[in-house]
C-alpha cells in the first residue's frame, strides 16, 4: 500500500526502530535501490557494518540504514498511533502496530500468546475495527 510517488511504506514506532514484519518498497526508485545495496552491504561486510551498530537485529539495522536516506519519500502506516495515549513507559506506536494500521483489515500478526490463541486480543486494538474478523 504505497503509491508510485512513495519510496517506502513501513510500520514505524516513534522514537524506536520500526516493526519489520511488513514493509513495501518501490523497486523502481533509485533511492530504494541504493537503500537495498547498503542494507545488504552491512550484512555482507559485517565487520564494517552491523557489528559496528549498537544492535544487530533486522528492525534496528533497517532503521539505521533508513536514516541514511533522509530524502526517501516514506509512508509510516502507524503514524496515526503516535497521538494515542500510550501506557506508562511505552514507545508511541509500539505494541501491535500492524492490526492498528490499515493492514489490520486484512492481516493479523500472531506470535507468542496470540499464536496459541489463534488471533490477537481485543485489548491489542487501539483503533476501531469494523471487519467481521474483529467482532
PLM feature spans:
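GT-A fold catalytic core of metal-dependent nucleotide-sugar glycosyltransferases
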Residues: 1-14, 24
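A glycosyltransferase accessory/donor-loop signature
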Residues: 27-135
Amino acid at each position: 500500500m504505497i503509491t508510485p510517488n512513495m519510496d517506502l511504506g513501513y510500520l514505524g514506532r516513534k522514537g524506536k526502530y520500526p516493526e519489520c514484519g511488513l514493509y513495501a518498497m518501490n523497486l523502481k526508485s533509485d533511492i530504494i535501490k541504493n537503500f537495498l545495496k547498503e542494507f545488504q552491504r552491512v550484512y555482507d561486510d559485517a565487520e564494517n557494518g552491523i557489528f559496528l551498530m549498537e544492535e544487530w537485529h533486522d528492525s534496528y539495522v533497517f532503521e539505521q540504514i533508513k536514516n541514511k536516506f533522509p530524502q526517501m519519500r516514506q509512508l509510516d502506516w502507524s503514524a496515526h498511533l503516535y497521538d494515542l495515549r500510550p501506557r506508562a513507559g511505552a514507545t508511541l506506536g509500539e505494541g501491535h502496530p500492524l492490526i492498528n494500521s490499515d493492514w489490520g483489515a486484512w492481516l493479523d500478526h500472531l506470535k507468542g500468546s496470540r499464536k496459541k490463541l489463534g488471533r490477537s486480543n481485543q485489548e491489542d486494538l487501539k483503533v476501531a475495527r469494523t471487519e467481521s474478523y474483529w467482532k
